[in-house]
A protein has these predicted regions:
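S-adenosyl-L-methionine-dependent methyltransferase catalytic core, i.e., the SAM/SAH-binding region
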Residues: 1-262
């Protein structure tokens, strides 16, 4: 869709570190695809001799293909090996996080990445179980956690637990901070940055950054007390429409925020 609206001299520079993503590449001379994390945006633009960009779009979601493919281990459905790596060449995976992180580290990631108020109890239960047997499969982890949810709350609870682990495996919040920080230098005047988030941890970061130009609760100011935030909001946020939800029910948690470089 972006290519359809792009002029003949425009460039679309795309990043995706997933090995499977190359199957969807369109044959178009305006498209430059790099199979790597988007934190390499600044480095890649230097390589392409591009000084500034007019727009940045970051879609932070996991694709349906990744969720549905058992070998990727993103889904909490039984029979999946716990993996969750976006970049399958990296060493650390979900098994490593679950079985080697300390109880305190697990508690922190469940609380910060998943907003789970009983994060300490969840971490304690996992640490007790892994002493008996290494947790490798989704059905094993689900069994360990079954005392924390009812049949009614099962899906939402497990989704947040798995989300917390996935964020840690892929260092998603650290990478999000990096791409937002780079956008201040790379966007041209009146350039637009748009970010699609799928959970509150991501959304809080983006909302604060667009509001303050940094990740602090207050904007950085000059000696006269004027805000140094280089952005203004394009709009507050957008949620999927009813028609969009019918096409893709997994988009229900998506939230789009946009800001303009001033």
């Amino acid at each position: 869709e972006i290519l359809k609206k792009l002029g003949s001299k425009g460039k679309l520079i795309a990043f995706d570190q997933d090995l499977d993503s190359q199957r969807n590449i369109i044959d178009d001379e305006r498209l430059f695809f790099f199979r790597q994390n988007n934190i390499f945006l600044m480095q890649t633009l230097e390589y392409l001799n591009v000084k500034k960009v007019d727009g940045i779009l970051a879609d932070l979601g996991v694709s349906s293909h990744q969720l549905d493919k058992k070998s990727r281990g993103f889904s909490f459905h039984p029979g999946h090996r716990l993996d969750m790596r976006m970049n399958q060449k990296q060493n650390i995976d979900a098994i490593e996080v679950i079985n080697s992180y300390s109880e305190h580290e697990l508690s922190n990631l469940f609380f910060l990445n998943g907003d789970l108020k009983n994060s300490k109890k969840i971490a304690k239960k996992i640490c007790a179980e892994r002493k008996n047997k290494k947790i490798v499969m989704t059905n094993h982890l689900n069994f360990v956690l079954e005392t924390f949810f009812s049949e009614k709350t099962k899906n939402s609870f497990l989704a947040r637990v798995y989300q917390s682990i996935r964020i840690e495996v892929n260092k998603e919040l650290e990478f999000l901070k990096e791409i937002l920080t780079q956008s201040k230098k790379l966007l041209s005047k009146n350039g637009i940055i748009s970010v699609i988030t799928y959970h509150s941890a991501e959304d809080r970061l983006v909302k604060r950054f667009f509001k303050n130009g940094c990740f602090n609760d207050e904007p950085v100011k000059d000696k006269f007390g004027n805000s140094l935030n280089p952005f203004k909001l394009k709009f507050q946020f957008l949620k999927p429409s009813e028609s969009e939800l019918k096409l893709n029910t997994r988009s229900r948690s998506a939230k789009l925020r946009s800001a303009i470089k001033i």
